[in-house]
Amino acid sequence: MDIIKNIEIAKVAARLAGKNLKDNYNSLNVTQLEEGRDIKLKADLESEKLIIEYISNESDYPILGEETGKSNLDLEDIFWVVDPLDGTANYNRGIPISAVSIALVENNNPVIGVIYDFNTDELYEGSVSSKAMMNDKPIFVSDIKDKSRGTLVTGLPVAMNYDEKNMQTLINNFQAWKKVRMIGSAAIASIYVASGKAELYTESGTNLWDVAAGVAICRAAGGHAVISNLSNDFSLDIEISNNLI
């Protein structure tokens, strides 16, 4: 595998998609499907189409996209994972916390990650053989060791059970931290940890395309990432930390 070549492929694809999402906001911010707490926009579909078209012309690896999907049988040991618009609900409401997220996965382990925050024009990258960077400048996780001084970033999955027991567990966990943030984008949450803005991002019942790129970037920044309970439909639990807390 040519790590450098594939990082460049992901970077170009992410920038193309991000530019389109920003430049054509009014025409792309059109609801295609709204189901419960989930929403799909024209932006999701058009962004994924653009990314898949570019990557397919540059790489032979199969692609797992959030919108188009793939079954386990269609994928190989190495495959791309694409979230064309992470933070769709934020994008829909004009909240500038969303990103394009692209990863290359080998044996279910993210080896390359690229996240493009098109709202701030910040491109984050990292791999198993390179340092984590933001716009070509090195980034590192924080050195905070205590939750009482740290920031937790988390989210409430679309399918979460809001019963009393689950909510009490959530509250008990929150109380240990100095600050807790819910920002509506797994990609942005993970780069907050990778760049030292937060110490832990954790979420249950999220998906591989939400976190794969962030896992690669955070590890390259000196952090620790654990994917657990990965299912056949690519749902999973995630914990991304500064490796100290």
Explain the meaning of each model-derived region.
Residues 91-94, 182-187, 206:
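Short glycine/threonine-rich catalytic loop with a Thr-x-Gly-x-Asp
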Residues 1-14, 18-19, 167-175, 188-245:
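Oxyanion/phosphate-interacting regions
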Residues 62, 178-179, 224:
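Conserved beta-strand segments of alpha/beta enzyme cores
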Residues 78-120:
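Glycine-rich active-site/cofactor-binding loop and its immediate structural neighborhood
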Residues 17, 21, 44, 55, ...:
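Residue-level signal for inorganic ion chemistry
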Residues 103-190, 234-245:
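Acidic beta-strand-loop-alpha-helix segment within the catalytic core
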Residues 1-85:
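N-terminal subdomain of lithium-sensitive/metallo-dependent phosphomonoesterases centered on the IMPase/IPPase/PAP
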Residues 62, 112, 151, 199-200:
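Short, Asp-centered acidic motifs that coordinate Mg2+ and/or phosphate
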